[in-house]
From Swiss-Prot:
Domain of life: Archaea
Keywords: Oxidoreductase
CDD domains reported for this sequence: TPP_PYR_PFOR_IOR-alpha_like
EC number(s) recorded for this UniProt protein: 1.2.7.7
Top-level taxonomy: Archaea, Methanobacteriati, Methanobacteriota, Methanomada group, Methanobacteria
GO BP: any one term: organic acid metabolic process
Molecular function as annotated in GO: 3-methyl-2-oxobutanoate dehydrogenase (ferredoxin) activity
UniProt subunit comment: Heterotrimer of the VorA, VorB and VorC subunits.
InterPro entries registered for this protein in UniProt: 2-oxoacid_oxidoreductase, PFOR_II, Pyrv_Fd/Flavodoxin_OxRdtase_N, THDP-binding, Transketo_C/PFOR_II
Gene that produces this protein: vorB
Keyword tRNA processing annotated: no
The protein's name in its UniProt record: Ketoisovalerate oxidoreductase subunit VorB
Catalytic activity line of the entry: 3-methyl-2-oxobutanoate + 2 oxidized [2Fe-2S]-[ferredoxin] + CoA = 2-methylpropanoyl-CoA + 2 reduced [2Fe-2S]-[ferredoxin] + CO2 + H(+)
Amino acid sequence: MATQMVKGNTAVIIGAMYAGCDCYFGYPITPASEILHEASRYFPMVGRKFVQAESEEAAINMVYGAAAAGHRVMTASSGPGISLKQEGISFLAGAELPAVIVDVMRAGPGLGNIGPEQGDYNQIVKGGGHGNYRNMVLAPSSVQEMCDLTMEAFELADKYRNPVVVLTDAVLGQMAEPLRFPEEAVEHRPDTSWAVCGNRETMKNLVTSIFLDFDELEEFNFYLQEKYARIEENEVRYEEYLVDDAEIVMVAYGISSRVARSAVETARAEGINVGLLRPITLFPFPSDRIRELADGGCRFISVEMSSGQMREDIRMASGCRDVELVNRMGGNLIELRDVLEKIREVAGDSSD
């Protein structure tokens, strides 16, 4: 198995190519531009389709077209670009089209800056565009997972015929770490009997998200909710670190989880029983595990580079218990000392 030092954004394209992605449509935006750049280098070399579109809106609609024709297709963007794609993502969900979207989060709102943030949580995890739809959302915390979870995203997208978002951030996208290349490439042979492939067999197929009859659209919406319930039942993924005897559990994803893990080790050395729960899927969210820990008396700290968007999901999952927050915004990274200060504060309250 080959190992090479690569950037996170490059790892995304490596994962996509090994997963059998044969179409990439995008538009450059910092800090996600290397994904498009690497696709432009490597996709044509092996006979795959790459187009730098004239806009973010054009790119996501090209994704729609390729997905409707049964291709494995992806795009990537950040911040303002993701906002421009939201209508198309809603159309993908409404037409039940599989596609992978990578969001390399940067600081906002508005133009913001190109520093790292996790402020797109609500936008991506709650759907973002119009209507009653959900994205499946995977949250890598390393360059290795940038590759591996991109590969998994394509499998999940095909399995559920739904958009899957790989939600990462500017640090993970730009940092370099050793990447173990996948052992073998996926031979993409999903059931595309529903697709419009330009042949006699698929002439009867209709790929659309429009329902002119109110009752038919309502029935379709109920069907979608049943699909999302199956996803919640079967696809929850998370990682635990020293949680079994923990009295305090931090919940963190992405780059923030790496700071939180270091804080666990330091606090444990001080005799504080603290652990880390890292959601790998943000939708579906590990709500049942959080409720189980809450019922066992654990207290929670949300560690995130946002205003506390994930904290609301932790609060709901824990039965509306208080959830402490350690956060930074504006492109600033969470520092170890800030997390340790909050752990000591909560531990002190617990011992009173």
